[in-house]
Amino acid sequence: MALISQSIKNLKGGISQQPDILRYPDQGSRQVNGWSSETEGLQKRPPLVFLNTLGDNGALGQAPYIHLINRDEHEQYYAVFTGSGIRVFDLSGNEKQVRYPNGSNYIKTANPRNDLRMVTVADYTFIVNRNVVAQKNTKSVNLPNYNPNQDGLINVRGGQYGRELIVHINGKDVAKYKIPDGSQPEHVNNTDAQWLAEELAKQMRTNLSDWTVNVGQGFIHVTAPSGQQIDSFTTKDGYADQLINPVTHYAQSFSKLPPNAPNGYMVKIVGDASKSADQYYVRYDAERKVWTETLGWNTEDQVLWETMPHALVRAADGNFDFKWLEWSPKSCGDVDTNPWPSFVGSSINDVFFFRNRLGFLSGENIILSRTAKYFNFYPASIANLSDDDPIDVAVSTNRIAILKYAVPFSEELLIWSDEAQFVLTASGTLTSKSVELNLTTQFDVQDRARPFGIGRNVYFASPRSSFTSIHRYYAVQDVSSVKNAEDITSHVPNYIPNGVFSICGSGTENFCSVLSHGDPSKIFMYKFLYLNEELRQQSWSHWDFGENVQVLACQSISSDMYVILRNEFNTFLARISFTKNAIDLQGEPYRAFMDMKIRYTIPSGTYNDDTFTTSIHIPTIYGANFGRGKITVLEPDGKITVFEQPTAGWNSDPWLRLSGNLEGRMVYIGFNINFVYEFSKFLIKQTADDGSTSTEDIGRLQLRRAWVNYENSGTFDIYVENQSSNWKYTMAGARLGSNTLRAGRLNLGTGQYRFPVVGNAKFNTVYILSDETTPLNIIGCGWEGNYLRRSSGI
């Protein structure tokens, strides 16, 4: 029997649900309210700092959709969509007024988490209700001065000697003029275009007594009286219409139009059948003396704004307006040449912003607005394509692929359906000609939680029978066009229950957070670290805020996480700061690890001279009620007083009674955090040069003792369980006799704590527990025992 030992360098690997013989040495069985720091080791998670009470338990609805608005460092808000309305809070918990100039029907829903999607661009938060069908306005419009079959033009270009000009309207000649043969010098005047126009108009006025005939620069405008119309309109000039030609509201080509025309006169350019150009409409602008492309006649040109995505807009007064958006109408073409975007007549599933275009997902289509014109989904011209025209493309796959989410990713747009992923990209400028949409991968995706991008990775949820897997989507190194995904929960397959509704995280602190209504009191944390494109750390654990608590949101800005949570009485906003060695509150003697931590000045009138106690009323401190948890009061000199939860809960006896007269004193109050870390079984493990781990599974390991290495740590307890026997060992922080030990101050210890562990290693359970307010940093651990093996391996 040989006495052996093994050291484990760190405990940064989180937990694993694999059998103990398959785990890495740095992985444990359970980690609650811990933080796996790649530099400081295993720590207590940062504390919740109380910011404000947002209302009672139901103030934000049953299952609200909560969106973080991060405009800049001074304008940061939580927008809460309750299902019946919107509430906006800044990140100090102060509520902003939300006005509804067009009502709030668009965001009314029984399930806002499932039905609402949104994206923020500057002061605008664009909001989509996936249950609302975008509809067109069925009212047809006509621009002013359009008189179908009532008027027409004669384009007069000039004359040619000896030619006869004839104007024929409704079956009769209304003007006829023979140009002289040019034998006399004065005949040149008879070939002048304007002279010919006046001559023909004079005859037309005589032959069409009730009609209006006007002459312009190079044209004649004839208008039928009320009750009559132009049924036929032709001209003859003996020169193939090169001298004069009729211009009704239809023309074969743009070259047939006169240089000038009455203001607002409209013509449809039918086009040459031998050319691929679409038909289009032009209208004369007399002020600018040009023909401009315009909207056709009897055309539906507008969507119903009330059925389109709305916006929550930050106003100049600091409050918010929820309102319709003024979506641009069509400016050219008709229903055939300028069709409706594919989202009209369908519901919109997501809204996004990509390459300076606002985009929608609807059915199997991706629709992008014109460049920098976010409310315009129609081309500026039918006759000429432009690089800034809108884009409307559909995915191509043999399966039905209803698109659910779009996430900008590595200069591309990653698009998700329930079972497949697509990438929209373009070489160079993104235009309707250069756009490419390709199927890249096929992974199942959970619809309720939006995929979230952190760095060069996108994290998404894949549901299984009872639990959810989280995948990391990435571009393969050196081959950016090749995409893949890996299951980062493969070693904890039964950890996150189904019902995931939020995936967030921070690229600053390298973590991803997951919320699930299957276990609403927890934040599931994935801590990772990549160095030179290699994964150096992946750690799963969870933060537990108590079974009576629901976490509604936990989104991050830089190194701060802002958490909205509620207990059975009230709803709160709190902050978690990941900054190392941070002092959360001014005057705090040290960073106290307490949840809902608050600085409080004890008011006068709270001291009772008879009992020599100062009584603090918990609802007065927070403006809210609490039911469960151990409370600690920390004084500026480091003295702490711990209050156990009353049997019936704090709501039955909401008073903290402190010894002595503390009126006017500043104290720090909060709920203790229960940190738990359970080690994997202490087994003999070998790590190869390639990083793989093998476990000695032959023989018997009889443990004798174990140790943990700690740094700048307060007190913690170690529990050892060996079947029916249980032991508890306490590390009290700084040791007696230490030069750094001072009365009335924070005393932290650094060193190694050794404790007995006896029995077969396969049956020992060892875990650390700490609910004190002091820090905890476990760097590594190790064990010592007798190893007996009957045979030698080969």
Swiss-Prot record:
Listed GO CC annotations: virus tail, tube
UniProt keywords, alphabetically: Viral genome ejection through host cell envelope, Viral penetration into host cytoplasm, Viral short tail ejection system, Viral tail protein, Viral tail tube protein, Virion, Virus entry into host cell
Compartmental location: Virion
Broad class of the protein's primary localization: virion
TM segment ranges: none
UniProt keyword Transmembrane, yes or no: no
Gene Ontology annotations of biological process type: symbiont genome ejection through host cell envelope, short tail mechanism
Protein function: Structural component of the short non-contractile tail. The tail complex is involved in viral genome delivery. Forms the end of the tail, including the canonical tube, the nozzle, and the small extensions below the fibers. Once the tail tubular structure is formed, the interface between gp11 and gp12 generates the proper environment to interact with the six gp17 trimers.
SUBUNIT field: Interacts with head-to-tail connector protein gp8, the tail component gp11, and the fiber protein gp17.
Name under which the protein is recorded: Tail tubular protein gp12
Lineage: Viruses, Duplodnaviria, Heunggongvirae, Uroviricota, Caudoviricetes
